[in-house]
Amino acid sequence: MKHTFNRRSFLKLGLLAPVLPLPAFAGQLSSGERRLSLHNLHTGEKLDRPYWIEGDYVAESLADINRVLRDHRTDQVAAIDPQLLDLLHRISAAVGASKPFEIISGYRSPASNLLLTENTSGVAKRSLHMEGKAIDLRLPGIPLADLRQAGLMLKGGGVGFYPESNFVHLDVGRVRTWGA
């Protein structure tokens, strides 16, 4: 079934988001199962599976997600915060995603983050990527501006908008926004 994302979908989401607590809102989007579909652009790895079933996180799926979202520079694997996974699930549902998230950056080791801060502008020295609480991504078929808007409306954390680099940053830190 093809889902069409439009302004009406965002309006409905916007009307529901303030009145439902975040966990209750997540439950409204999925009855008994939360699934993620990911494609790491640096490693080529793909994953499409439920990570939460009937109120419990699935340990094997979480381990596989941690591996797919590892630091591609150092091959270091770290635990990804389940709140970030829940945020991705809610965003996927909000925009009616039919394709996997394309991952630019998931977990980032301190060594990789230091390298990026020295060679790239706009990289935070204390990035939430190093805690498994942030991700840079895009979603084929969904305009970046719509992905950004979904992140803003869900108020799950920080939303950075990088249209010149073709990605959106999402994290589960404090609610804030930056970028074009």
Predicted regions located by residue number:
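N-terminal secretory signal peptides and thylakoid transit peptides that target proteins
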Residues: 1-18
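Catalytic cores and adjacent binding grooves of peptidoglycan-active enzymes
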Residues: 2, 34-39, 122-180
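C-terminal segment of N-terminal export signals and the immediately downstream linker at the start
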Residues: 22-51
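Active-site acidic/histidine clusters and adjacent loop/turn architecture
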Residues: 54-104
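Structured segments of extracytoplasmic/periplasmic soluble domains
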Residues: 68, 87-98, 119-122, 140, ...
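Extracytoplasmic/secreted envelope proteins and their assembly/folding machinery
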Residues: 85-89, 113, 144, 148
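Acidic helix-start/capping segments at beta-turn-to-alpha-helix junctions
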Residues: 100-114
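Charged, often glycine-rich, active-site loop that binds/positions anionic groups
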Residues: 110-127
